[in-house]
C-alpha cells in the first residue's frame, strides 16, 4: 500500500492499514470513518455528498438519499474492500430516483451494479458486454456470495 495513505486524514475519513485497525465501528466514531483500503475513500466521500442533494435533484421531485441509505451504501463499499480484491477499481456512486444509491464497479467488459433502496433492501445485477447476466439481492453477510460476485468482476481485468 502506498505510504502516502498510511495516515491520511480528511474531514470524514481516516485511513489506517488493516493490520493496525481491523475493526471499524462508524457509529461510535461520529464523523470519522476508518477504511480498509485507499480505494474506498473517494466512493465513500461521494456517497456522503449525496445527502446534501436538494429535493427534486432529478427534476421529478425525488428526495436525496437518507442517512440510513447512505450508511448502507458505505457498508457495501466497506464489505467489498474487506473481500481482498485489490485489483478492482473503486465504484462510481450515483443517486437513484426515489432516494436510493447506486454503486457501479467496472472491470473490462464486466460491470457489477449494487443498488441500495430507501427501504434498506440492496439489489445487484452483473452485466457483461452490456447484457444483464444475473440479478438478485446483494448479500452483506455471509460474504461468500459477494466474494463470488467480485471474483467474477475481477476476472474481467
What are these regions (language model features)?
Residues 111, 117-123, 127-128, 132:
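Long, acidic/polar E/Q/S-rich protein-interaction regions used at subunit-assembly interfaces
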Residues 1-92, 126-157:
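Eukaryotic low-complexity, non-globular regulatory regions
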Residues 73-118:
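Amphipathic, interaction-prone secondary-structure segments
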Amino acid at each position: 500500500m502506498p505510504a502516502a495513505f498510511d495516515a491520511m486524514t480528511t474531514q470524514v475519513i481516516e485511513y489506517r492499514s488493516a493490520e493496525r485497525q481491523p475493526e471499524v465501528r462508524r457509529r461510535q466514531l461520529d464523523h470519522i470513518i476508518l477504511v480498509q483500503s485507499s480505494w474506498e475513500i473517494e466512493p465513500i466521500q461521494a456517497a456522503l455528498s449525496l445527502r446534501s442533494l436538494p429535493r427534486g435533484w432529478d427534476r421529478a421531485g425525488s428526495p436525496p438519499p437518507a442517512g440510513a441509505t447512505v450508511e448502507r451504501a458505505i457498508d457495501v463499499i466497506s464489505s467489498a474492500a474487506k473481500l481482498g480484491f485489490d485489483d478492482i477499481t473503486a465504484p462510481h456512486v450515483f443517486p437513484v430516483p426515489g432516494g436510493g444509491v447506486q454503486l457501479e464497479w467496472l472491470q473490462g467488459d464486466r460491470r457489477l451494479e449494487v443498488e441500495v433502496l430507501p427501504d434498506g433492501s440492496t439489489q445487484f445485477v452483473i452485466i457483461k458486454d452490456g447484457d444483464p447476466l444475473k440479478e438478485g439481492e446483494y448479500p452483506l453477510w455471509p460474504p461468500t456470495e459477494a466474494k463470488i460476485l467480485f471474483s467474477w468482476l475481477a476476472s474481467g481485468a
